[in-house]
């Protein structure tokens, strides 16, 4: 059975945000390219094995089923996603120092 993939627009926005921050603000364009490739590659890996991540552990019940996995080579960044047994829903990519529960609640409440 093929896994369905849904990607929330917030994922693309955050990848672009951090890519630009690394490339421009930190003046490291090669690292920014590696970051984007690592984030995209991680989504493909999750398609093959959605159980790779672990429960994020958020208290609000509407966030209780969200999984997280670190971006390879960039451990301060994580991809947050849901897996219902058929569909992989990639929600966002965040720096782990953020106020993650409120950020994710805002994202998932927006279609």
Give a label for each model feature.
Residues 1, 65, 75:
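Exposed loop/turn and edge beta-strand positions of beta-sandwich/beta-sheet ligand-binding modules
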Residues 1-40:
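Arg/Lys-rich, positively charged N-terminal/basic patches that mediate binding to nucleic acids
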Residues 20, 27, 44, 48-52, ...:
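Generic structural signal for secondary-structure transition and capping sites
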Residues 44-72:
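A short, surface-exposed loop/turn module that caps and links secondary-structure elements
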Residues 71-111:
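Enriched for short, Lys/Arg-rich terminal
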């Amino acid at each position: 059975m093929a896994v369905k993939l849904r990607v929330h627009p917030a994922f693309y926005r955050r990848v672009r945000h951090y890519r630009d921050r690394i490339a421009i603000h930190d003046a490291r364009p090669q690292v920014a390219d590696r970051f984007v490739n690592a984030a995209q590659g991680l989504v493909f890996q999750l398609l093959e094995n959605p159980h790779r991540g672990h429960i994020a552990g958020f208290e609000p019940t509407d966030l209780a089923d969200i999984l997280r996995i670190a971006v390879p080579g960039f451990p301060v960044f994580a991809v947050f996603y849901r897996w219902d047994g058929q569909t992989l829903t990639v929600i966002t990519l965040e720096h782990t120092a953020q106020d993650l529960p409120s950020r994710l609640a805002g994202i998932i409440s927006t279609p």
